[in-house]
Amino acid sequence: MAASMARLWWPFLARQGLRSRGRCVCSQNPRRSFATEKRVRNLLYEHAREGYSELPYLDMESVCACPEKAARSLELRKGELRPADLPAIISTWQELRQLREQIRSLEAEKEAVAEAVRALLANQDSDQVQKDPQYQGLRARGREIRKQLTPLYPQETQLEEQLYQQALRLPNQTHPDTPVGDESQARVVRVVGEKPAFSFQPRGHLEIGEKLDIIRQKRLSHVSGHRSYYLRGAGALLQHGLVNFTLSKLVSRGFTPMTVPDLLRGAVFEGCGMTPNANPSQIYNIDPSRFEDLNLAGTAEVGLAGYFMDHSVAFRDLPVRMVCASTCYRAETDTGKEPWGLYRVHHFTKVEMFGVTGPGLEQSSQLLDEFLSLQVEILTELGLHFRVLDMPTQELGLPAYRKFDIEAWMPGRGRYGEVTSASNCTDFQSRRLYIMFETETGELQFAHTVNATACAVPRVLIALLESNQQKDGSVLVPAALQPYLGTDRITAPTHVPLQYIGPNQPQKPRLPGQSATR
């Protein structure tokens, strides 16, 4: 499989001037144990070195052509790498390029020597050719070349690993109109609707949900841990309604519905610009003693990107639009933020849009605008008040060239809360994962990728419950969701359907087999 993949990509790589040695090491070295590996690993690089994919295509030519621009991007994003790290990366790349040129020259000479030897053998008998001074000189030169090449290959591997360990942490380029700074510098580009007015003090979504018996978050630490929740009755129907409403709208607009794996290899995460082996990380890792290098996805974006990994899209199908509803898993390591409620939870349902376009900013920017318009349309039909933000440099992460967030008003919280995000990743992800398209002339080129939240269910639920609450405790259902709930209002049950009978309560009910005095 590795050999066939190398044959597939080699014409493209050769045209781009990138050389991959194509050595599959999976049969030469045993797999290293995740349990014993202590150094910081680059799973995407290892994935390629083991022969599963080609080495990520680093656009180091652009970095070296304008190092000041690359350093400026590092400074503005305030990420893991700083401008002071850039010279070492450039130096390593230049050293590796020179070494590979030396190897190429020696290998070409070795092939020429071998060809000359074959010609002599074809024209003379074996006994006679052994005495030929030209033959002896060629054999001596061949041995000398092999001796020169022997130490160069491990040097190449060492430099290559050193380069990828650092260069894969370089961020994407940044849109010139992106605000500079942290999230406080986000630019409001649009406001939709008005804040709902109440004749009473609005309640938070958790209080509303508990009184309506549609959300349960209490007494779950021994069941599913902190930051977990149940949705019941109308709460569950709201979730299903939001998913079906969103999917129906997007499928009618030409999106292809997808389901994706929840468990994915670390290389796919890193190809998307995420770091599953960081410490701390928001990504859940499966026990490596049983399943090496599997992680729970925090967004369907990873699975959708993995679907296109090492594949080319037909030119006539561009732009490709995909939509997927999935369960997302996030560690939410900063437990000091939003410890209760549905705003920050370990698992939730989300509908995600993902697009693949041809090259050039014009096409991917148009698709980003389209995704953003769909987000606005969905939230408007749900009757929410929200604002669209152009996110600043420190909020872009590694992959985003430009990013827009939408924050919905949440009256119970008394502030806006993020409900969607949309990012143009240009060719950042496709260069790492080899997401490509085939032109009408049969040429392979890197595609652009765009991703956007269509509906993050728990946060939209917060906005809906808090914005549509009534004085009597009921909640009005938006017209767009009424067909899925079969009602226009959610009301409290007439009795208590489930009563806690466990320990740690003042008046514990008597269980079977217990005496009244116990």
Curated annotation (Swiss-Prot):
It comes from the Eukaryota. Its EC number is 6.1.1.11. Keywords: Acetylation, Aminoacyl-tRNA synthetase, ATP-binding, Ligase, Mitochondrion, Nucleotide-binding, Protein biosynthesis, Transit peptide. The keyword Transferase does not apply. One of its GO terms (cellular component) is mitochondrion. Residues 1-34 form a transit peptide. L-serine binds at T299, A300, E301, E352, T453. Ubiquitous. The modification N6-succinyllysine is found at K195, K337. GO terms for molecular function: ATP binding; serine-tRNA ligase activity. It is an enzyme of class 6 (ligase). It is found in: Mitochondrion matrix. The modification N6-acetyllysine is found at K110. Residues 497-518 are annotated as: Disordered. Belongs to the class-II aminoacyl-tRNA synthetase family. Type-1 seryl-tRNA synthetase subfamily. Catalyzes the attachment of serine to tRNA(Ser). Is also probably able to aminoacylate tRNA(Sec) with serine, to form the misacylated tRNA L-seryl-tRNA(Sec), which will be further converted into selenocysteinyl-tRNA(Sec). Homodimer. The tRNA molecule probably binds across the dimer. This is Serine--tRNA ligase, mitochondrial. It comes from Mus musculus. The lineage of its organism: Eukaryota, Metazoa, Chordata, Craniata, Vertebrata. The gene is Sars2.
